[in-house]
């Protein structure tokens, strides 16, 4: 008895359990419990009611025809929801008003049909695809199951490996053709069947097949197997390229030469391919690339009997070597060529002391003109210029067998990273024993590494050796520092690149003291004494001639660099009085003359590297010119400021980083168009065109000649005119505004009571009395201050008068020296011959003080053949000057160049003294001195007024 029934009070009627059922009959045949039956009955009744009421057509009579007659509905709906009624009305009205209602509907159905059709096709394709999968064995697997002969026929005529293998005879054609497939049949067929196919099995088969291949085809096969098997567990869907996949292993004929000639040598190309044995050494990694190189001979020559231009000993090529060191691959060996070039060609240890590669290759933070090019450390012996050991002198190609610098011996033993021999450096030491040019064989190789920070200091324009062709050693000494122009330029023959082999070993020794030699000019020496001294990583200093007992480029005995192969590293350490002597800064290839170079060294403590140019301690910075040509200004007197700037670019009165662009060849700063040499260094238009047209650097001698032709057209070229023109240039006005004056362009020499203080006042004051000396920057001392003083355009009123002379246009001076003026008698004032020189080029030619002018005139009078104002000797330092007698004896007392008196040179009026900027304390350019033609006569003691000498080369 069901408890629910018993508990129910029959007095109360119950709901019908189900439609058409009476309450009493439900329990008999309904399998559900009473409670569930009751719930079910309720649900059923609700369903029936909904069905009866909602299914009536009259309820939705208006909707029966697709809402075509909905016009009454909006009112009905509006009662309930006016907004909905409005929307409905709009919708229905729009629907009914569509002109192409049926067509729209048809289009909708058609679109739907297209979609459905696509879907149906996809479904059918999906359904049909499984049979393809099941038939996969008949695809690739079926081909794999074919007999070798069948495979051979079906392999395809384009399968190159089949021919290669059969011709090579390494395997039968059947094997060759099947080998790529050997592993795949199982993997592919089984993959089609099940994803659990053992990959190893296919791998084994593939490896077995590969073993039968030519080694050359193995690499591709191995890679192919690796690729296929790695993902072999994936089912391979039917592919159009399934057969091609079978042949991909043989699709690489490049490495499959039947001759088994290794196309490239690399052992790192593929890690696991035995075939790569053919590619023995291909690698961009220095680990293999450099080590692969042939063993280097101790002398650094190429292991082959070939003497490739003595490349191992070529400084230029060697300089490239250390840079290569950081390259991922050695440039000497092409990644594609095994052991191609002699490694030392580029790996020469000769530049053991080269800067770090990135430092050399990336322009320093302040890219000076010269620094733009890769600085190649110059050999300390001063011999190596970037191009062929010595400048562009190709004659220097042979190794310098004459002197085998001990430095080379030391270099071998030293553990430089680049030292191929002792240091175990990457690059074999190319200059081991072949007497390599001392340029890279520094005795002791004192600086194994140059601190790029030192080399590239913004204020110190270490001239990048890249343009060493301009360096002193160059066959053509192009516009060395203009102040030293006479040294190198005049004696161009000395500038010819004499390989260090010719330079006496003593020159490389730091102990050599040229101070004892008042002139310090040793004709036997190459144009630059310290061939390597000032060659900081940037390059050798321009002038190494010792002037007035001051070795311009030689390291001091007591200098920090005195010991070891840095003999010249302190290129211009001066042995003279450090206090008074105006030291010429050791010039890098590009450093401008800076006073007190020795003191700079001492103060700087060798700036960390002999190669790194010392910062100008006195002036606070070295010249800003980075052009290979040293910023021509000679070192200003120690006390003077670096105020003078070239008239051309007037970079502000500092020689520092803003120095005007200077032609690395001729040192000119005035040119209508700046060009660049292959090193990226600035060249004037003339030098650039010459180099472009002739392929060789333009000799300074040509420059001088050209200048004469161009600028001297208006003046008489009488020998005496030199005094006049010089007088004109060196008008008594000592004060020329420093801004207009070019560095080193003029030297203000004032003789004070006991010591001649070369002080140039930047102020444009009219020339002070003869006794008055200008206080000014050292540079100004070097360059005349344009101002009240006579300009080239104006003629000094009287050369002898100590009074100031009114001057014409300020600093307006033609590029060339003013046309020669009438030569005043020795005591006579220079004829006031005003040559109207167009201010075409603002050049401030220094005007000598009247007294000096008179002296000059006297000197010129005595020497009718005295140099013309801008004679090649004067401006460019042509060899003419060398021929001129230089009767120049400096008295010991006047040896100090801090004070430079006319008497200090002990020059007789008759003798034409060769005065170099170094003698004048670097304040005066040698050309200026020489141009004065015996700058000071013995009577010049009277000339107390500072004299400014501007020589053409300086400005140009």
Curated annotation (Swiss-Prot):
Keyword Membrane on entry: no
Name the source's superkingdom.
Answer: Eukaryota
List localization entries: Nucleus
Q: Where do Low complexity bias regions lie?
A: 15-37, 623-633, 640-661, 812-839
Feature: compositional bias, Basic and acidic residues:
1-12
Start-end of GATA-type zinc fingers: 663-687
The alphabetized list of GO BP terms reads: negative regulation of transcription by RNA polymerase II; nitrate assimilation; positive regulation of transcription by RNA polymerase II
> Which parts of this chain are annotated as the region Disordered?
1-51, 120-222, 240-262, 348-373, 524-661, 708-890
**Cellular component, GO, one term:** nucleus
Keyword annotations:
Activator, DNA-binding, Metal-binding, Nitrate assimilation, Nucleus, Transcription, Transcription regulation, Zinc, Zinc-finger
Q: Which InterPro entries match?
A: AreA_GATA (IPR013860), Transcription_factor_GATA (IPR039355), Znf_GATA (IPR000679), Znf_NHR/GATA (IPR013088)
Entry GO MF terms: DNA-binding transcription factor activity, RNA polymerase II-specific; RNA polymerase II cis-regulatory region sequence-specific DNA binding; zinc ion binding
Q: What is its main location?
A: nucleus
The biased composition feature labelled Polar residues covers 42-51, 131-153, 167-194, 208-217, 588-613, 713-760, 849-863, 872-881
Sorted alphabetically, which Pfam families does this protein's record hold? GATA, GATA_AreA
Biological role stated in the UniProt entry: Major nitrogen regulatory protein; activates expression of nitrogen-regulated genes.
Protein's name in the database: Nitrogen regulatory protein NUT1
- Tell me what organism the protein belongs to: Pyricularia oryzae (strain 70-15 / ATCC MYA-4617 / FGSC 8958) (Rice blast fungus)
